[in-house]
Amino acid sequence: MKKILCICLSSTLQRSISFKTVALEKVNRSEYYRYDASGKAVNSARVLTQLEKGCAVVACPLGERNLSLFTDLAARDNLELSYVTIPGSTRECWTLLDRTAGTTTEIVVSEPVLEADEDLKAVASAEIKLLKYINDVLPEVDAVLLAGSRPKIWSDDLYATLCGMTHDNGKIFLADYIGEDMKKTLAASIPDIIKINEEEFRATFPECNDQTLEQAIIRKSQELNNIIVITRGCDSTYAADHGQFYECPTEKVNPVNTTACGDSFNAGFLYEYLQTGDLDKALKKGTWCAARNAELETPGAIHA
């Protein structure tokens, strides 16, 4: 069995709330809701666990105030969870599902930024513990999936450090993040796989904006000597492997909850790529997982 370490610094408690309809500036009464342990890499880990139980392990920080809720939800989904605690609460995201319109609206409820000296010392200690755990487990896994934004309480170069640690252990690193974290990573150690969407690619590599997307990812993957995968919503997915271009059509589905479709794609893609080394098969598996996720209420799932 191939094993994947899923690292999530933006752990989330996801509340998916179902409405017959959602109307702005009105009182909206829900039909029901569900809670899930979430965050981009956590969602990917849930899909991986459904693909093959035991193939994924999650490393993440969790707020101490609502710790048990997150760990109970993770246990319900058979997630192998290794965590460090930090002051405060794990943030929540609320997904509003409009059954009539078939739309998904996500509200991210950010927690107050930790600024007290005592809290920051606790975070620094948690970061050391997290890095130690990751360093210890890297020899036991085949790849690392690092996805999502880095809260400002963590070291500026943490993502670059994690990519370097992964490569020092001879493992594959998939990066699903952008901005300064991606720039610092590229300056230190090139991710084997960069998977982002078209808007994120254009923002991260503005020097490519005078090229078509196909030309841009071909040239950038040649320059970086890696794999770049660009999802484009309902449109086909583009990819380039060291300059060789690939395209994979999406599946048409009747969506229930589109939250975590990208995370589900990451899971299927990396799972299949580790099994076969075949990029075309990996793109198809990622697409299949994203489509199955869209048909379900659970964020990051391929079956109920």
Where are these regions (language model features)?
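Positively charged, low-complexity intrinsically disordered leader regions
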Residues: 1-25
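Substrate-binding N-lobe of the ribokinase-like
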Residues: 29-91
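Short beta-strand scaffold segments in enzyme catalytic cores
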Residues: 46, 92-96, 236-240
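Gly/Ala-rich phosphate-binding loop of Rossmann-like dinucleotide-binding domains
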Residues: 49, 186, 274
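Conserved phosphate-binding/catalytic loop of the ribokinase/pfkB sugar-kinase fold
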Residues: 95-140
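Short acidic, glycine-rich surface-loop motifs adjacent to enzyme active sites
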Residues: 138-152
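Conserved phosphate/ATP/ADP-binding segment of small-molecule kinases
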Residues: 156-244
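Conserved phosphate-binding/catalytic region of the ribokinase-like
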Residues: 211-304
